[in-house]
Amino acid sequence: DKVGAQTIAQADDLKIIVRAGAGYDNIDLEAATKAGVVVMNTPGQNANAVAELAIGLMIYMARNQFNPSTGVEIAGKTLGIQGFGNVGSLVAAKALALGMKVRAFDPVKSDEDMLVRGVEPTSSVKTLYADCDYISLNLPLVTVTERSVGYDLLSAMPKGGVLINTARKEIVDES
């Protein structure tokens, strides 16, 4: 649910808004600031649930939406992780346990942080998309990530490649 300016204005004694999970995109930060309301979030609080969802969606797609006569295993497939933070690192651990090869791109995380977890770092996001059967999108919604995944990256994926977006919908440019 969104916490907009009208809701904030009507809550005379409101002092703090705490959002479960990462991000603030469902809260009108300008209205909260004007009203003197502190806004907080709980990054990482639901990271495991989101990572499990990403893995579940990969299995669902690999099994052709659980059509009993078709589908493939994910073991041996390559997973690319865009964004190696709380969720991305958990997705990597779960994918490795299922026998997947895992690569990642994150301009903030060090290669060593990925390597120590058994993940191969990639030098560019385009390389990640071109080399992976599945991409797990785990980015915050900020100015630089909004609409950052579009035709150029998606068309670089191998035939049959699957994008799993458990981040914010606004990161994918659907135009």
What are the roles of these predicted feature ranges?
Residues 1-66, 71:
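Phosphate/diphosphate ligand-binding glycine-rich loop within oxidoreductases
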Residues 3-5, 109-175:
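Rossmann-like adenosine-cofactor binding region
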Residues 5, 26, 84, 89-90, ...:
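Residues forming the Rossmann-fold NAD(P)(H) cofactor-binding site
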Residues 14, 75-79, 151, 160:
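Phosphate-coordination loops involved in phosphoryl transfer and adenosine-cofactor binding
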Residues 61-94:
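Glycine-rich NAD(P)-binding loop of Rossmann-like domains
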Residues 92, 100-101:
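Residues at the starts of beta-strands that form the adenosine-phosphate
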Residues 106:
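Conserved acidic E/D residue at the C-terminus of a beta-strand in Rossmann-like folds
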